[in-house]
Protein backbone atom coordinates (compact mmCIF):
# COMPACT_ATOMS: atom_id res chain seq x y z
CA UNK A 1 0.00 0.00 0.00
CA UNK A 2 1.43 3.42 -0.91
CA UNK A 3 2.09 6.13 1.64
CA UNK A 4 -0.52 8.89 2.01
CA UNK A 5 0.38 12.37 3.20
CA UNK A 6 -1.81 13.67 6.05
CA UNK A 7 -2.29 17.44 6.26
CA UNK A 8 -5.27 18.57 8.37
CA UNK A 9 -7.19 21.66 7.26
CA UNK A 10 -5.65 24.80 8.74
CA UNK A 11 -2.20 23.30 9.31
CA UNK A 12 0.72 25.72 9.27
CA UNK A 13 3.53 25.25 6.79
CA UNK A 14 6.34 23.22 8.40
CA UNK A 15 9.67 24.87 9.25
CA UNK A 16 11.53 22.12 7.39
CA UNK A 17 10.82 19.62 4.58
CA UNK A 18 8.24 17.37 6.28
CA UNK A 19 4.47 16.95 6.60
CA UNK A 20 2.30 16.73 9.74
CA UNK A 21 1.69 13.04 9.20
CA UNK A 22 1.82 10.05 6.89
CA UNK A 23 -0.35 6.95 6.65
CA UNK A 24 1.00 3.61 5.42
CA UNK A 25 -0.50 0.15 5.91
CA UNK A 26 -2.90 1.39 8.59
CA UNK A 27 -0.17 3.11 10.60
CA UNK A 28 -0.21 6.87 11.14
CA UNK A 29 3.15 8.52 11.80
CA UNK A 30 2.74 12.02 13.25
CA UNK A 31 5.75 14.32 12.97
CA UNK A 32 7.17 16.03 16.02
CA UNK A 33 4.51 18.56 16.99
CA UNK A 34 4.97 21.81 18.89
CA UNK A 35 2.54 24.51 20.03
CA UNK A 36 2.79 26.77 16.97
CA UNK A 37 0.32 29.20 15.45
CA UNK A 38 -0.33 29.48 11.68
CA UNK A 39 2.93 31.44 11.27
CA UNK A 40 5.11 29.02 13.28
CA UNK A 41 5.25 31.28 16.32
CA UNK A 42 5.29 29.52 19.69
CA UNK A 43 2.00 29.74 21.58
CA UNK A 44 1.67 29.90 25.39
CA UNK A 45 5.40 30.58 25.92
CA UNK A 46 5.38 30.10 29.71
CA UNK A 47 2.58 27.56 30.05
CA UNK A 48 3.52 23.87 29.74
CA UNK A 49 -0.10 22.76 30.23
CA UNK A 50 -1.45 24.98 27.45
CA UNK A 51 1.39 23.96 25.12
CA UNK A 52 0.80 20.27 25.82
CA UNK A 53 -2.95 20.63 25.24
CA UNK A 54 -2.34 22.43 21.93
CA UNK A 55 0.21 19.82 20.82
CA UNK A 56 -2.12 16.91 21.61
CA UNK A 57 -5.10 18.62 19.96
CA UNK A 58 -2.97 19.08 16.84
CA UNK A 59 -1.90 15.43 16.94
CA UNK A 60 -5.56 14.41 17.35
CA UNK A 61 -6.44 16.38 14.19
CA UNK A 62 -3.76 14.55 12.20
CA UNK A 63 -4.94 11.15 13.44
CA UNK A 64 -8.61 11.99 12.83
CA UNK A 65 -7.80 13.25 9.33
CA UNK A 66 -6.27 9.81 8.69
CA UNK A 67 -9.44 8.13 9.98
CA UNK A 68 -8.34 7.22 13.50
CA UNK A 69 -8.81 8.33 17.09
CA UNK A 70 -6.51 8.95 20.03
CA UNK A 71 -7.42 5.44 21.24
CA UNK A 72 -5.42 4.17 18.24
CA UNK A 73 -2.18 5.73 19.50
CA UNK A 74 0.40 3.07 20.31
CA UNK A 75 3.55 5.14 20.94
CA UNK A 76 4.56 8.70 21.82
CA UNK A 77 8.01 10.26 21.84
CA UNK A 78 7.99 13.23 24.22
CA UNK A 79 10.68 15.89 24.34
CA UNK A 80 10.63 18.50 27.12
CA UNK A 81 12.98 21.37 27.87
CA UNK A 82 12.80 21.22 31.67
CA UNK A 83 11.91 18.42 34.09
CA UNK A 84 10.12 20.97 36.30
CA UNK A 85 7.31 20.85 33.71
CA UNK A 86 7.03 17.04 33.75
CA UNK A 87 4.06 16.83 36.16
CA UNK A 88 2.12 19.57 34.35
CA UNK A 89 2.70 17.91 30.98
CA UNK A 90 1.62 14.52 32.36
CA UNK A 91 -1.56 16.03 33.82
CA UNK A 92 -2.74 17.18 30.39
CA UNK A 93 -1.36 14.07 28.65
CA UNK A 94 -3.52 11.85 30.90
CA UNK A 95 -6.67 13.71 29.75
CA UNK A 96 -6.01 12.64 26.16
CA UNK A 97 -5.32 9.00 27.10
CA UNK A 98 -7.91 8.13 29.78
CA UNK A 99 -8.03 4.38 29.08
CA UNK A 100 -5.19 2.12 28.11
CA UNK A 101 -2.07 4.26 27.79
CA UNK A 102 0.25 4.06 24.79
CA UNK A 103 3.92 3.21 25.24
CA UNK A 104 6.17 6.27 25.34
CA UNK A 105 9.45 7.79 26.30
CA UNK A 106 10.26 11.27 27.57
CA UNK A 107 13.61 13.05 27.44
CA UNK A 108 14.83 16.52 28.34
CA UNK A 109 16.48 18.40 25.49
CA UNK A 110 16.58 21.68 23.61
CA UNK A 111 13.83 22.30 21.04
CA UNK A 112 13.78 24.16 17.72
CA UNK A 113 12.46 27.40 19.26
CA UNK A 114 13.52 28.75 22.67
CA UNK A 115 9.96 29.29 23.99
CA UNK A 116 8.83 25.77 23.06
CA UNK A 117 8.47 23.61 26.18
CA UNK A 118 7.21 20.30 24.78
CA UNK A 119 7.28 18.40 21.49
CA UNK A 120 5.51 15.09 20.83
CA UNK A 121 5.81 12.65 17.92
CA UNK A 122 3.20 9.89 17.68
CA UNK A 123 2.50 6.53 16.07
CA UNK A 124 -1.07 5.23 15.80
CA UNK A 125 -2.40 1.96 14.36
CA UNK A 126 -5.83 2.43 12.81
CA UNK A 127 -8.08 -0.61 12.96
CA UNK A 128 -9.36 -1.75 9.59
Swiss-Prot record:
Disulphide bonds annotated for this chain are none
A GO cellular component term found in this entry reads: cytosol
What GO biological process terms are annotated to this protein in UniProt?
Answer: nitrogen utilization; uracil catabolic process
State a single Gene Ontology molecular function: deaminase activity
Keyword terms, alphabetized: Hydrolase
Q: Which PANTHER family match?
A: 2-IMINOBUTANOATE/2-IMINOPROPANOATE DEAMINASE RIDA (PTHR11803), PROTEIN HMF1-RELATED (PTHR11803:SF58)
Q: Domain comment text?
A: Contains a hydrophobic cavity in the center of the structure and ligand-binding clefts between two subunits.
Q: What's the protein called, per UniProt?
A: 3-aminoacrylate deaminase RutC
In its UniProt entry, the species of origin is given as Escherichia coli O6:H1 (strain CFT073 / ATCC 700928 / UPEC)
